[in-house]
Amino acid sequence: MPLTYLKKQYRARQTRWTPTGDQFAFADSVDFLNHEHWDLASAGSGPLFGRAYLACLEAHKPAQLSFKYALVYRQGQPVACLVMQVLDSDLSVFLPRNSPLAHGGRLLSTRIFICGSLLCWGNRGVAVRQGIKPETVWPSVAEAIYRVRRSARLSGETDFVLVRDLPSAHPDSAILEDYSYSTVDVEADMVLNLRDWKSYDDYLGSLQSKYRKAAKDVLKNISKAGCVVEELADFESYEQRLFELYRLVLERIF
């Protein structure tokens, strides 16, 4: 057993320090990369790898978040693309706001490098071109992440690296274990079954009692304050204000 383990570790070390032979293009914005090549690499991977979506995300990102992108080339042809994020924050984001430790956490800065997205679930970090075997690309993914991290040292050290979210049954990504990555279990995606609700009371009736009581208490407090809850019919007139409130919630998360 010890000999088998040592052989495995030696092989993994050799893999980590051996270039893949693929070529790379890196950028701080998706618009800086070759548009045609990005579209070829991301075709079939869904709209969240689309340039229009990513450009919109860049324009309206949280203040502490920055983006990195990479195209992987093999023999001059694009075979994969990567979407990466860098979060510069402090340790208070991992604590409840009313925690006595939150203030101390603000004094400790942290940098998290993510291949994927903190703003949604699923694999939003790696798209492999159709017709390319994914298992041949993951070593290049690890090399691309390493290169971007090395260049990012000019603005600070990275404390943690995430590649998210990959299902446990994803065999190809297991190759990343040879590059010192390990698996971390995360919570399952939330699935909300929409019921045949016709009114707000129908919605409240479907909640657990403690949540239903909390919602009713909020309505009672609004009524006591002399306020009136009305249906928003003219949505377009309040569209900007609603978006500002949404942004406020998003900024508080980070």
Describe each PLM feature range.
Residues M1-F254:
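N-acyltransferase acceptor-side catalytic subdomain
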